Amino acid sequence: DMKNMVTMGLMALILAKRTGVRLERDLIFAAVADEEAGSHEGALYLVEEHPEKVRAEYVLNEVGGHTLFMGDNRFYPIQVSEKGICWFEMTVEGEPGHGSMPRPDNSVVRLGRALARLGEARLPQHNLPVVENFLRTLAAGSPFPNKAVLPLLLQPRFASTLLSLLEKHELEKAIGINAMLRNTASPTMMEAGKKVNVIPSSAKARVDGRILPGQSLEQFLAEVQRVVGPEVKINVIDHHEGTTFDADTPLYDTICQVLDERDPGGTPVPYMIPGFTDSFAYARLGATCYGFSPVKLGPDLNFTRMYHGHDERIPVDGFKWGLRTLWDVVHRFVT
């Protein structure tokens, strides 16, 4: 889901070769295929087994640099932070039996109730400085009602009610903001039973948990356990912590300068993505990583709705704009 960034990164390397620029620092292109599966066979493999090939002061990665409209104003979020993961399995035990005789301790029913509680709950709110700055910056450049509503989302006593109202009118915006304010857990897979007329003795579900930077695995699991109840056994499948990088760097300044030239009037703003990228792996080598895969968008395209959707796509003109923008950043920074 980031073939545009792969192409732009490769093209930047090709352009550096074609133009014969004199490099003042190494320029490394790394392409791997398993970020969606946890990065174990890709970025983590490179970091752990071949660190000399990918050791760098800075990394430019996916998710950032796309146009975000608030009214008539344009913003360009630059990813400086991302959540960690906790992929886990929920298991509920029950008494097996014949399907013709319903049981109150049916493991499938009990798991369903636990999943419903998890799906309906909002875990506790934890405001991060990068998220506070992001929402306040958007508010300052937005018309009413966003100008008033966005800062109120930082106050837990108002946030839940406002998000529920926002979900009825702008669902994608609501779920995106909600995921920036708290740890989240989305059930994605279920498994129970082998035969239609047999009540199984156990039922399982897999859940995609995302943890805010600064929150521990133990804190997250405690939040989830309080919601699903003590009868649910939780087993962690995979986990890594979230990351946050300093935006006060020469590379970040270069990105802002180029964006100002490529789209005067647009406002760069650091932000946190609710997902994760390979940046968490490269951070283990001390790299400062930014999500910057620029794409210029029109006001009618909901870009984040494309992620993992039925029709993932980007506009061709926006891609061409992004290719030139990324090259300008790379060229200016490495020469």
Regions found by a protein language model. Give the residues of each.
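Zn-dependent metallopeptidase/amidohydrolase metal-coordination segment
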Residues: 241, 265-334
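Acidic/histidine-rich catalytic neighborhood of metal-dependent amide-processing enzymes
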Residues: 2-77
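Active-site-adjacent substrate-binding region
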Residues: 115-124, 140, 145-147, 161, ...
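Acidic-enriched catalytic cores of C-N bond-cleaving enzymes acting on peptides and small amides
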Residues: 51-58, 64-73, 78-87, 99-190, ...
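A structural signal for short, well-ordered beta-strand segments
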Residues: 29, 90-92, 207
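C-terminal substrate/ligand-recognition segments
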Residues: 192-227, 240, 244-259, 268
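Short, conserved micro-motifs enriched in small and acidic residues
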Residues: 1-7, 36, 105, 313-320
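Short glycine/serine- and small hydrophobic-enriched flexible loop segments
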Residues: 11-18, 113-117, 328-331
